[in-house]
A protein has these predicted regions:
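Conserved N-lobe loop of protein kinases adjacent to the ATP-binding glycine-rich P-loop
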Residues: 67-74, 81-85
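Protein kinase glycine-rich loop
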Residues: 52-58, 63
């Protein structure tokens, strides 16, 4: 008999996995979403976030799909995980640094990560800025929970639409993004990573 973990889908969080495929949302088990440094699916963070599949890893962090067990909503969890400073992850989820000589740099970066989450939380309601719902420390590092954006990024949009449609969408978005960046800069923050991959378009535009 399958265990609850084997039946639970890491995307829709329904007990609908059969033979590696979710009978509810259609998700097919993807081994590429289980990296050696990723937290295990269905780990629990901050006593209320049930982790699902990993959505990707950048130079400074790993993003996971998650479910808020208090209200049942899905969200994204961003983990502070600078790959140049972290050597590995321990079995209990704690991060292990490449060396104690990097401790100060890691802690400084972690505090900036938390401060940025706190600042972005103050911008909730701005349609061009993702809502930050929570932030906390655990496993020797830091995390923040943000709203799940259902849609695609600008690069994916470009592949599926003609140049005129892409240009109109990009122009509309640049006006919103410019306004949002002005607010972010007012708080003394610099994004530093504006790219088509990081510009998200919701399903309703």
């Amino acid at each position: 008999m399958a265990t609850l973990e084997e039946k639970l889908c890491p995307v829709c969080f329904q007990e609908a996995m059969e033979g590696g495929k979710c009978q509810n949302c259609g998700y097919v088990l993807d081994k590429a979403s289980v990296g050696k440094n990723y937290l295990r699916s269905f780990s629990i963070l901050n006593t209320k976030y049930l982790l699902g599949k990993s959505l990707g890893q950048g130079g400074f962090g790993i993003t996971y799909l998650a479910k808020n067990m208090l209200n049942g909503s899905r969200c994204c969890i961003k983990e502070y995980f600078p790959s140049n400073l972290i050597q590995s992850r321990m079995p209990d989820g704690t991060v292990a640094l490449t060396g104690e000589e990097n401790r100060c740099e890691f802690e400084d970066g972690k505090q900036r990560f938390i401060e940025e989450a706190r600042t972005l939380q103050e911008l909730r309601g701005n349609v061009a800025v993702v809502d930050i719902q929570d932030f906390f420390e655990e496993n020797g590092t830091a995390y923040f929970a943000m709203e799940l954006i259902e849609g695609c990024n600008l690069r994916a949009f470009k592949k599926e639409h003609n140049e005129e449609q892409t240009f109109k969408m990009a122009l509309q978005m640049l006006l919103l993004i410019g306004s949002a960046l002005a607010e972010v800069h007012r708080f003394g923050m610099i994004h530093g990573d504006i790219s088509p991959e990081n510009i998200l378009i919701t399903q309703n535009g």
